[in-house]
Amino acid sequence: MPRRKRNAGSSSDGTEDSDFSTDLEHTDSSESDGTSRRSARVTRSSARLSQSSQDSSPVRNLQSFGTEEPAYSTRRVTRSQQQPTPVTPKKYPLRQTRSSGSETEQVVDFSDRETKNTADHDESPPRTPTGNAPSSESDIDISSPNVSHDESIAKDMSLKDSGSDLSHRPKRRRFHESYNFNMKCPTPGCNSLGHLTGKHERHFSISGCPLYHNLSADECKVRAQSRDKQIEERMLSHRQDDNNRHATRHQAPTERQLRYKEKVAELRKKRNSGLSKEQKEKYMEHRQTYGNTREPLLENLTSEYDLDLFRRAQARASEDLEKLRLQGQITEGSNMIKTIAFGRYELDTWYHSPYPEEYARLGRLYMCEFCLKYMKSQTILRRHMAKCVWKHPPGDEIYRKGSISVFEVDGKKNKIYCQNLCLLAKLFLDHKTLYYDVEPFLFYVMTEADNTGCHLIGYFSKEKNSFLNYNVSCILTMPQYMRQGYGKMLIDFSYLLSKVEEKVGSPERPLSDLGLISYRSYWKEVLLRYLHNFQGKEISIKEISQETAVNPVDIVSTLQALQMLKYWKGKHLVLKRQDLIDEWIAKEAKRSNSNKTMDPSCLKWTPPKGT
């Protein structure tokens, strides 16, 4: 069968101008004497492709025109002859009845001049094939006999035209888009149904697993409803308090807040003194049965109020983690070391650390606690420990009191050890950015000695030449030694070095959350001790800074936090609050770890030259 040529208008984008997905035929009697008719056939596929090119440009209004002036011209243009022109008039095919002769189509060319002259008789142009076209008695829908063949042709042509366009390629699923596909909760025996927050139907992590927290999905939903109800009541009471409260400079607590404080004090008085024998047996049985796959039983360990507060914090943290997972900011199982075997401890990591890729893909990392070398398996670690001769950090021991020692390690002389120490610290610090460039720093490593060696407690790093007088660049206490007073000892030791150097020091910003809490506590203790021993009437922040080696900015911020700094009659006054001093003295008397202090007489150190 001979192939028919296409009759199309030349558009600026190089495609045939057509707004319909049917085979059209048009016979014009007024042009039969002057213009030879040319036959063309437009398939569904070519019509769809031309339609997609025309949809991007605004459609001009179809104008009526008079018969005495020719308003169109037919022209035979092939695809290879089409050239883009800056201004091309819009063309629309006219539908008419199919004649028994040949299949023909003529394209009407509306010029801008004629559309302006006939603006009073405008009509809406035909829309897309899915839209509504102007209906008339001569409109006939013609279907192609080879629909599947036409669709395959259109698909092939569209792939060729969009070969260089990446937007036409199938989009790859990201983690958060395929989060609910082929995933399950890692807790043994869990079917991934329910969520700790009570707001989701499924979960895929331990943080949102009701079974891990010894709860059921229904119990989580009931607790969520109770929390929402309490939040609504609290918001309503806050609105009432805001309406009744005047905008004063010093606002006293409201009656509702005072009642709530008394209620909390009464609830905490009901705390059980200890566990009974039956409860201890129950807890031990639960621990032996489930091990680390379930959360330990927490009932009767503290007051009901504190336990409920802890449960709320758990649910809120789980909700925040769920949002981060859905946004793709947390990808579980990809380049994340979950645990490390460090000496006799197994530590859960908090953050990602840039270990080499072959180690970062492991879920568990094995590490020598003396030389800090990291390994892939328990066998490699056992063989290494049999040959490792290190029993303490490298460098000079500059402090020793009892079993506590501090070693000064130069990052230039012991580069590998300091790099491994930084990689280890990044597992527990979020804002740490120093990993490999350790040569300009000194590292002060605190250890605790026993018959097997000196075990790492924590460390802090310090620039050799700090122009801003930073006495700490990075500080870390190992998780197994936290909440035992060692962090405050490291901070005190850094200020002890500043006193020997006769400088005023301050930690480098930004501080981590735990670091800020530790430093606030240390500054508070230093100021209260100084005010307790001070007997004069006038005090100077500069004198406090010179005696304690604490930066004046840190002193002022701590005084403001304690509400001990006031402005009165054009002067700044430091108030000596005896109630805070008495409270601090009582806490100092109750502390059992009185040996967790740094003794300046045990320091054997001189400042390095050039600092």
Swiss-Prot record:
MF (Gene Ontology): chromatin binding; DNA replication origin binding; histone acetyltransferase activity; histone H3 acetyltransferase activity; histone H3K14 acetyltransferase activity; histone H3K23 acetyltransferase activity; histone H3K4 acetyltransferase activity; histone H4 acetyltransferase activity
Cell location: Nucleus; Chromosome; Chromosome, Centromere; Cytoplasm, Cytosol
Zinc finger (CCHHC-type): 176-219
ZnF endpoints (C2HC MYST-type): 365-390
Pfam families in UniProt: MOZ_SAS, zf-C2HC, zf-MYST
InterPro entries noted in UniProt: Acyl_CoA_acyltransferase, HAT_MYST-type, MYST_HAT, WH-like_DNA-bd_sf, Zf-MYST, Znf_C2H2C, Znf_C2H2C_sf
Cross-link (Glycyl lysine isopeptide (Lys-Gly) (interchain with G-Cter in SUMO2)): 323
Claim: Transcription is one of the keywords in the record: yes
Domain remarks in the Swiss-Prot or TrEMBL record: The C2HC MYST-type zinc finger is required for interaction with MCM2 and ORC1.
Entry function: Catalytic subunit of histone acetyltransferase HBO1 complexes, which specifically mediate acetylation of histone H3 at 'Lys-14' (H3K14ac), thereby regulating various processes, such as gene transcription, protein ubiquitination, immune regulation, stem cell pluripotent and self-renewal maintenance and embryonic development. Some complexes also catalyze acetylation of histone H4 at 'Lys-5', 'Lys-8' and 'Lys-12' (H4K5ac, H4K8ac and H4K12ac, respectively), regulating DNA replication initiation, regulating DNA replication initiation. Plays a central role in the maintenance of leukemia stem cells in acute myeloid leukemia (AML). Acts by mediating acetylation of histone H3 at 'Lys-14' (H3K14ac), thereby facilitating the processivity of RNA polymerase II to maintain the high expression of key genes, such as HOXA9 and HOXA10 that help to sustain the functional properties of leukemia stem cells.
Official protein name in the record: Histone acetyltransferase KAT7
Native species: Homo sapiens (Human)
Lineage: Eukaryota, Metazoa, Chordata, Craniata, Vertebrata
